[in-house]
């Protein structure tokens, strides 16, 4: 997907990028490739592939109508090089973005990226989701939590649901359909007072399969969750 094809797809969805936004995506690509030589950020560095499999892929929740340009508070867990939240922030400047990542080198990259892109309303924290999920500053404070190819739902639910306000949404982006995964996650979702409201398969413009799953939080999360760092993955609910 060339940058021009990317812009055209957005126009077809009613979004016309300004010159500033186009430059932000261009700068994002350049910094991603530069920094990828120092630290491992992505296996994808070809320009057209980055625009398709990182930029376009990240904004799927916007293109499908699940996020609008309003002062939503969005937490991105395990964003790595900033996907999906930074492309969404470029598109919709009104949203407020927080990223938690376990690798400090990636946080350093994100700080430089945000500075170069002149983004405001972005906050980056180094650490584990399990630890932040028990912190009153972060717990039950977000409208939306996003996670792109982070963990299977049985584990992901415990890492993300505690951060949501009641009626907040987890938006999980994955490469393939999640039917069996959701069956395995039924107990975890029930324990965390949350339920799947959207499970939708779609395709990227090149035909690659993708899945978006949205989970809604119905009640406050029991205090014992999330458990200590590493436990959700070793002993899923």
UniProtKB/Swiss-Prot annotation:
| Leading EC class | transferase
In short, the EC number is 2.1.1.-
Quote one Gene Ontology molecular function term: rRNA (guanine-N7-)-methyltransferase activity
- Sequence intervals crossing the membrane: none
Region of interest called Disordered, as start-end residue ranges on this chain: 216-237
Could you name the Gene Ontology cellular component terms for this entry?
Answer: cytosol
Print the keywords alphabetically: Cytoplasm, Methyltransferase, rRNA processing, S-adenosyl-L-methionine, Transferase
Entry binding sites for S-adenosyl-L-methionine? 78, 83, 129-130, 148
Tell me where in or outside the cell this protein is found.
Cytoplasm
Origin: domain of life: Bacteria
InterPro entries documented for this protein: rRNA_ssu_MeTfrase_G, SAM-dependent_MTases_sf
Under the heading NCBIfam families, the entry gives: rsmG_gidB (TIGR00138)
Q: Which HAMAP family match?
A: 16SrRNA_methyltr_G
Enumerate the PANTHER family for this protein: S-ADENOSYL-L-METHIONINE-DEPENDENT METHYLTRANSFERASES SUPERFAMILY PROTEIN
What does this protein's UniProt record list under function?
A: Specifically methylates the N7 position of a guanine in 16S rRNA.
Which family does the record claim for this protein?
Belongs to the methyltransferase superfamily. RNA methyltransferase RsmG family.
* Protein's name according to its UniProt entry: Ribosomal RNA small subunit methyltransferase G
Source lineage: Bacteria, Bacillati, Bacillota, Bacilli, Lactobacillales
């Amino acid at each position: 997907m060339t940058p021009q094809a990317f812009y055209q797809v957005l126009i077809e969805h009613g979004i016309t990028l300004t010159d500033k936004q186009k430059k932000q995506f261009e700068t994002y690509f350049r910094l991603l490739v530069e920094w990828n030589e120092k630290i491992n950020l992505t296996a994808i560095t070809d320009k057209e592939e980055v625009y398709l499999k990182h930029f376009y892929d990240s904004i799927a929740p916007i293109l499908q109508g699940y996020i609008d340009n309003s002062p939503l508070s969005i937490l991105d867990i395990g964003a790595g090089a900033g996907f999906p939240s930074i492309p969404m922030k470029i598109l919709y400047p009104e949203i407020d973005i927080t990223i938690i990542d376990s690798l400090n080198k990636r946080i350093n990259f994100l700080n430089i990226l945000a500075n170069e892109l002149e983004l405001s309303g972005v906050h980056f924290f180094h650490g584990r989701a399990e630890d932040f999920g028990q912190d009153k500053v972060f717990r039950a404070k977000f409208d939306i939590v996003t996670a792109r190819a982070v963990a299977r739902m049985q584990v992901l639910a415990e890492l993300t649901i505690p951060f949501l306000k009641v009626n907040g949404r987890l938006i999980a982006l994955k490469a393939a359909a999640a039917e069996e995964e959701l069956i395995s996650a039924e107990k975890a979702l029930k324990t965390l007072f949350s339920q799947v409201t959207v499970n939708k398969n779609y395709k990227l413009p090149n035909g690659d399969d993708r899945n978006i799953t949205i989970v809604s939080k119905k009640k406050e999360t029991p205090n014992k969750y999330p458990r200590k760092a590493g436990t959700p993955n070793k002993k899923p609910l």
